[in-house]
Structure formats: structure tokens, C-alpha cells
Regions:
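Conserved catalytic core of the tyrosine transesterase superfamily
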Residues: 2-339
Length: 339
């Protein structure tokens, strides 16, 4: 079987290959007895970092991991990930690098991201027959750092969320759009990175349902509470229109709505920040609206398995990290303990 993986997206991450390589394609040939990693360039050598980055589905993940691999490369004495000798990577190098970073105050979560990136490169090198099996196993055996930090972010109060929504003027296109966006994050738990790619044809007004592709390229169906559906319907019926395409788009100063000019996740973050400031509330991020959604479901006795599905999480442990009920929930639970 031949799997064809193009480097086009990887080349947009802020680094480049040689002219000869920039048009190359990565060919992964597999058979029962062996796995060979080659390119259409004359050299048989494959940069394991490029091969690893090609396996990542998210553009943000590729950018983040490429940045970390560049940091490691410079620490190891190379210019960047392009000329780092990845096939010679050993666990001792990784441990020394991690120790030097943590000595400067690097957090455990960041260390684990570096470790994941370097393990991924080691695996790509091993697949390409660059790194021997023993060295790969030694690197793969490195354990993640154990750490605990108090959870960041917060859950909005009901008065805050009401004021946030009511502050949007439905007489204007910007107000109607922003109310629909904020309602989807508060009432459906959507990520800010999911908002820009919602499409009208995936919305079912009669069923108050919306199908989307979220983090990790996972498709899920969300159901809109009545107030959320009303906000979305007002945006569509009074401003957006019913033509197929992106559900939300940019709105220019002259009032023109451009559905061919999508929002980006940072734009959704700025909308949240601006609306919170206009409502004179404590600072909150777009992700805090998602935390609010999960916290309220759990507070209303929705089982955590259902909440996990509604959030689009892969495991319950991730969902539990969104719980911001605080000491009040534990005090109420303590009253139910039976001696």
C-alpha cells in the first residue's frame, strides 16, 4: 500500500526546505516484512521532524510542535529542526534538555509537550530505519512528568451570562452575530476554534441540532436549547440569509457581511473579551464559556458520561477538568453522606 502525504501545510509553518525538497512528496511504502520511508528527492535521508509533523492533523498542533522542536534543535547546537541530526537522538539528550528547561522554571505540562514531540520524532526516525530499535524503545520508555496545578479559568455566574447575552443589540448585524456565537459557546459548549467552521447546511432548525467537526477531526452532533436556537435563527433570518456556506463571517464597518471571509479563533476570543468588558464583568475567555457549560450541566446532575459526549471529549478525565463547582458542591455532597 502506498500512502501519499504532501508537505504543503508543513511548509507554511514558518520554516522551509531546499528548493528541490519543497515540491517533494513523502512516500510511505509498507509491506508485511518492512516499512520504508523515502522521498522523491535523490537523497534517501528523511528528516524525522518533517515526517512526524506530517502525522499531526491540526495546523495549530503542527505549529506548536514545530516551535518546540526548533527550541530543542538550538539547544542541541543546530540552527533549527531542518539540520538537527534526529537519528542520533538519545534519551540522555532528552533528559538533559528537560532538566535545563525545568531549572529555568518550565511547567510540567510544557515539559510533557516537549517529551511528546521528541518521542514522535524518534518514532518517525525508527520507522525510516534511521534510529535503531533499542534507542527508540529507550526513548519511548521515558515517563511524563507528574504535576498538579490548581485549575485555571472560571465559570460565569448566571447574572454574568445573562448580561453578556442581553448586551448584544439584535437590531445590528454585529450584535445578532455575536449573540448567536456567545449563545453557542455558553449553551452548547462549543470551542472557539469550532465556531468559524460551522456551516448553515449542517444546521437543522426543526430538530434544533447542529453537526460539526471538532478537535481531533471528530464529528459530533450538538442540540441547541431553545434560547440558543432563537439567537441563531434571528442571525440567519434577519441578517445572514439562507444561502449555503459558513454560518458566520466577518462584518465590515459598512455593514457588509462576508461569508467568504471566515472568522478565526482569535476573532472569537476578541468578541468574548469585548462583550465581557461592555457588560462590566470580570475578565473571562471564550474557553470560560465552555467551562461554564460543563459546570452547569454537572451542577444540574447530568451524568459525566453524557457531558463528555456533549463536550466532544475523548475521555472523562478531560471532562472532569472543566468542573468549576467549587467548595459549595462538596459541602452539599457531604450533607448526603450516611453514617
Amino acid at each position: 500500500m502506498i500512502l501519499l502525504v504532501r508537505y504543503n501545510e508543513i511548509l507554511q509553518l514558518g520554516f522551509c526546505m531546499t528548493t528541490q525538497q519543497s515540491s517533494s512528496e513523502l512516500l510511505i511504502s509498507t509491506s508485511e516484512n518492512r516499512t520504508a520511508l523515502t522521498t522523491d528527492v535523490q537523497s534517501e535521508h528523511v528528516n524525522a521532524a518533517y515526517a512526524y509533523l506530517a502525522t499531526l492533523h491540526s495546523e495549530n498542533s503542527r505549529k506548536s510542535m514545530a516551535s518546540k522542536l526548533n527550541v530543542f534543535s538550538r539547544w542541541a547546537g543546530f540552527q533549527d529542526l531542518r539540520d538537527c541530526e534526529w537519528d542520533r537522538l538519545r534519551p540522555e539528550h532528552i533528559l538533559a534538555f528537560m532538566a535545563s528547561r525545568e531549572k529555568k522554571g518550565q511547567r510540567g505540562s510544557t515539559s510533557n509537550c516537549y517529551l511528546a514531540a521528541l518521542k514522535g520524532v524518534a518514532k518517525s526516525s525508527w520507522i525510516a530505519h534511521g534510529m535503531n530499535h533499542e534507542d527508540y524503545l529507550r526513548i519511548n520508555a521515558l515517563k511524563q512528568r507528574r504535576y498538579y496545578r490548581l485549575p485555571t479559568g472560571r465559570s460565569l455566574s448566571y447574572s454574568e451570562s445573562r448580561a453578556l447575552i442581553e448586551n448584544c443589540d439584535l437590531e445590528t448585524s454585529i450584535g445578532a452575530r455575536d449573540k448567536a456565537i456567545l449563545s453557542l459557546m455558553l449553551g452548547c459548549g462549543l470551542r472557539r476554534g469550532e465556531i468559524p467552521f460551522l456551516r448553515l447546511e449542517d444546521y437543522e432548525p426543526k430538530n434544533r441540532a447542529l453537526t460539526l467537526v471538532g478537535k481531533g477531526d471528530k464529528e459530533r452532533r450538538v442540540f441547541l436549547p431553545q434560547p440558543v436556537a432563537e439567537s441563531v435563527n434571528i442571525w440567519i433570518e434577519h441578517f445572514r440569509g439562507t444561502e449555503k456556506g459558513l454560518l458566520f463571517g466577518r462584518i465590515f464597518k459598512n455593514g457588509r457581511i462576508s461569508l467568504g471571509d471566515p472568522l478565526d479563533p482569535s476573532s472569537v476570543g476578541r468578541i468574548t473579551k469585548r462583550r465581557m468588558e461592555e457588560a462590566n464583568h470580570e475578565k473571562a475567555t471564550a474557553h470560560d464559556l465552555r467551562r461554564t457549560f460543563a459546570t452547569r450541566l454537572l451542577a444540574n446532575q447530568v451524568d459525566i458520561v453524557t457531558v463528555k459526549k456533549m463536550m466532544g471529549h475523548a475521555n472523562i478525565a478531560t471532562t472532569a477538568m472543566y468542573d468549576r463547582r467549587g467548595d459549595e458542591a462538596m459541602q452539599a455532597a457531604a450533607e448526603k453522606a450516611v453514617l
